Amino acid sequence: MIYVECKADKSLVHVIADIRPYEIEHCPGKNEVLKKLLKDKKSIGIIDEDPNASSPPELKKFKSRKSKLSLKFYYEESNNNLLIIICPNLENWIIEASIEGKINLNSYDLPSNPVDFHNIINLNITKFQNLLHGLLKKENERLLTLRECIENYIRNGNCPHLR
């Protein structure tokens, strides 16, 4: 199972990885993602870092393993769970991916301001999904890294970024 904190995260996982929608569960906030993850085995949680917010106490049960492309990878050994933290948050991460891929957000009717971007993708998830497909066509390294980790962990219980 993959636990995420918002519908945009759910769309991200569904679009970039070969994961069925029923294998992705939307939880109301990062605390709930972590609680669900700690009750499950061999699962993945995806949350935003949100550096200005306080860290949930459950985060202490996960060990930091590696960081790559503004993704932080954590591991919880007792239940064999993976936690992926998107830094600083999904909106900024995707905007940066678009800049790196030389994708004009205006061509997807999306703003480059993270707050406005957040509001728009939550009102019209299709625009966000179209952007994700555009990033994948350009073989964006951020999305490919996240995809590789999710798919490998679900299939083999192994993420190359935990080593």
Give the location of each predicted region.
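RecA-like P-loop NTPase motor core
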Residues: 1-44
